[in-house]
Each structure stands twice: as structure tokens, then as C-alpha cells.
């Protein structure tokens, strides 16, 4: 049994190292995003039960497809980052950070997921600290502002 646990830990560490080397700065946001996706999906199912709503495999599949589409938004951000880096490299500019747009997209998605998780918890009957939901909403707003063009003046 101890051998299997050790093998599992080694495999998990190797997977983490591989993903970290592949994603770089995106590793932590993507990991958090996927964790939030799973938690939101589970709390959403439980909250639907508490609200007396019928949950079907079709509704569940739609939720999963939505989560996968959210992952694709990060891919779109990464593609934009890669294009910008390629264009900058072409003219001799070295951007200090790669995957900036993708990181902002991932943080925005994480904020949306956290809002949904907290709302699901409220529907389940969990008492949450009164400052938590407004704080997450503020972080989401700040993330949205980070992606907006700055006005010169």
C-alpha cells in the first residue's frame, strides 16, 4: 500500500512539474480555475437539490460544456499573448511577461466561479462572512478594469 501511495505522489509531482514547465506563469491560475470549476459544479448540483430543482444529465452536460468553454477563453488569451509576443519579437521588443492576457482571463473566470460558489453556498444555507461576496465582486471589477484600454488625457 505504501508503494502505491509513493508511486501516486511521484506521478502527481511529475504531472505538476510537466504542467508547470508547459504553462509557466499560467500554471497557478489554471490550477485554481479548474479547482473552482469542479467546486462550482458540485455546489451547483447540491444547491439545485436544495432549491428543489430537477437536475438531469442534459443540464449537467451543459454545465460541463460551459466549463470547457471557459477554459477555451484562457486559450484565446494565450493565443493573443503569443501573437503579441511574436509581433514584439519581430521588431526587437522583448515583453517582460508572457501570458498576461491569459492570466487576466483566468483570474476573471476564477472570480466568476467564486461568486457562483458563494451564491450556491448561500442557497444551500451556509452562512458566509458578509464581506466575502462583495470582496470577490470587487476583485472581479478590478480585473475587468485591468483589461480595459486606458484613456489618455
Language model: regions and residue ranges:
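Membrane-proximal cytosolic segments adjacent to transmembrane helices
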Residues: 1-8, 94, 111-153
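Short, strongly hydrophobic alpha-helical membrane anchors
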Residues: 1-22
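Alpha-helical transmembrane segments of multipass membrane proteins
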Residues: 14-18, 45, 75, 79
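Transmembrane helix interruption/hinge and helix-loop junction motifs
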Residues: 22-29
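Alpha-helical transmembrane segments of multi-pass membrane proteins
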Residues: 33-40, 70-78, 105-116
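N-terminal intrinsically disordered, cationic/polar leader segments
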Residues: 35-47, 92
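Juxtamembrane helix-capping/reentrant segments at transmembrane boundaries
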Residues: 51-74
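Hydrophobic alpha-helical transmembrane segments and immediately flanking/interface helices
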Residues: 85-114
Amino acid at each position: 500500500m505504501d508503494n502505491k501511495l509513493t508511486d501516486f505522489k511521484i506521478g502527481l509531482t511529475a504531472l505538476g512539474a510537466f504542467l508547470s514547465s508547459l504553462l509557466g506563469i499560467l500554471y497557478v491560475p489554471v490550477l485554481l480555475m479548474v479547482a473552482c470549476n469542479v467546486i462550482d459544479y458540485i455546489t451547483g448540483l447540491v444547491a439545485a437539490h436544495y432549491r428543489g430543482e430537477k437536475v438531469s444529465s442534459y443540464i449537467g452536460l451543459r454545465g460541463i460544456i460551459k466549463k470547457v468553454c471557459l477554459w477555451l477563453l484562457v486559450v484565446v488569451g494565450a493565443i493573443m499573448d503569443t501573437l503579441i509576443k511574436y509581433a514584439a519579437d519581430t521588431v526587437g521588443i522583448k515583453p517582460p511577461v508572457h501570458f498576461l492576457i491569459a492570466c487576466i482571463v483566468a483570474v476573471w473566470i476564477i472570480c466568476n466561479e467564486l461568486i457562483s460558489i458563494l451564491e450556491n453556498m448561500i442557497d444551500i444555507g451556509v452562512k458566509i462572512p458578509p464581506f466575502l461576496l462583495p470582496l470577490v465582486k470587487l476583485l472581479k471589477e478590478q480585473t475587468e478594469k485591468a483589461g480595459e484600454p486606458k484613456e489618455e488625457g
